């Protein structure tokens, strides 16, 4: 299978004067994740969704992240957002093979110290995002107005994405889900299954490894990518 490295750095540099990273945390913001998504989508041959296709909602103005916790000096809290598709597309999430669906956003996290857990309920070994309602703007798999891709209210791209990831994928995955029937997120730190078997059983068509480089360089679980049997 073909493999490629997506040049996200160039896209982020072009928007370096915008709030693409939190001041008090090591993660990118939803805006930063969006620009990363655009670079990835273009590399995949998808037409990226435009910012205007989402409604940005501020969910917290009191986010103090990991950098603040380590440094311990006073800092202005960060603002957290979620972006909702204006076309009405809806998803549900299943965490660690749970039988009952949950939302993509953990509202209770906003009242806790770990507010970043708001995005996809934090770190799970396995997360599945399923589309339950397709949008009504006529955009097909590539967001290019392909009405023929709509069937019975669902977008039938026939493709499944697996993101092998760290927590940087938590705010990225909802954007990627615009182009797939299902998106799986595998965190190798907590995933104890056989990865190759999982990919085959779920019929995964596309794989993305998404990591923050400093974390990936010292991550001791990536050997599982090459594990067989």
Give the label of every model feature segment.
Residues 1-229:
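Extracellular glycan-modifying ectodomains
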